[in-house]
Amino acid sequence: VDFGSIESFPLNKFEKIMDLNVKSVFSCIQEAIKMMKSDGDEGKIITIGSIASKWTGRGGDGSYSASKYAVYGMIESIARQLHGSGSNIAVGLICPGVVDTTLTNPDKDQKPNWMRPTTIADSVLHMVTAPKNVNIFDLTIFGMDEKPW
């Protein structure tokens, strides 16, 4: 992820981040809803967002935070739209903090307190296996040594 100040951050990089983090989510959810509506109008859509959608402005990550904030707003709007129309499609969002992956930790140094990808997978499983009459909309998780606020 590119980080930079607003004065020097190139517009084309900002657009690339928005395409990757917002437009792609919109396209996937749009198609998922079409498929679910044609197959009984029920199901669960779980989106992976970021803790950056909630605790924004941590220095030079404005474009990334803005994209994740947009995803949060979009998911909330879609959830309200579906619920308001009487649909049985539930929409949820997981907002993780730092996860130990090759993207966040390219040197593969041992980060004992960072979340593992399996933590996120377990969270998805928790959301999708909730009873049909329960929708877990927002699940924010982060490592104990992460200071998001």
Region annotations inferred by a language model:
Residues 29, 67:
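Active-site helix of classical SDR
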Residues 89, 93-94, 109-149:
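C-terminal helical subdomain
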Residues 55-56, 77-89:
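Active-site-adjacent segment of SDR/Rossmann-fold oxidoreductases
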Residues 31-41, 85:
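A short helix-coil junction within the Rossmann-fold of NAD(P)-dependent oxidoreductases
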Residues 50:
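Residue(s) in the substrate-gating loop at a strand-loop-helix junction
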